[in-house]
Regions:
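Metallo-beta-lactamase
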Residues: 1-71
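C-terminal regulatory/interaction regions
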Residues: 78-152
Length: 152
């Protein structure tokens, strides 16, 4: 049996749960989706991202562990989602002045919504700087002087 899973199951996780960021209790629905996938017992999964895989039980276990981590610490999911959106922008533009990148973030209401709804601690600008630094540390972006570039 073959399952085309889109973002519901990847070999090492799943996609960002955007409804959860917007205030819906969508982590429960994701858990139910993983239960359904498990009950279907697919032999092969074609994910929305990454290679086709056959170790479905292992992938489900990884996804459940990741989901449990997000349930225990929803701010972790928010940080992950924000970095995904930053990376998508870098994939789109490849390179741009850092000031323009930050201006884009500040002008994008979704980032402010995520910050206001899910986080406490640093101010918004500091949070964005931390996210960008994490992208650079992970090799997903490169800062060269006044420019930020896509990497990886």
């Amino acid at each position: 049996r073959i399952l085309i899973s889109a973002d519901a199951l990847w070999e090492r996780g799943f996609g960002v749960v955007f409804p959860e960021l917007e205030g819906d209790d969508a982590f429960d629905e994701l858990g139910e989706t993983l239960d359904l996938i498990e009950s279907l017992a697919p032999a092969t999964v074609i994910p929305g991202h990454g290679a086709v895989f056959t170790e479905v039980d292992k992938a489900i276990a990884i996804a459940r562990e990741r989901l449990n981590g997000f349930l225990a610490n929803p701010a972790k999911h928010t940080r992950h989602a924000a970095k995904v959106l930053l990376k998508f922008k870098l994939l789109e533009v490849q390179s741009l002045p850092y000031a323009a990148f930050i201006a884009w973030v500040q002008a994008t209401p979704y980032f402010r919504m995520m910050f206001d709804r899910h986080l406490s601690g640093p101010d918004f600008g500091q949070w964005i700087d931390e996210l960008v630094a994490e992208l650079v540390r992970s090799g997903a972006a490169i800062r060269e002087g006044l420019v930020i570039r896509n990497a990886g």
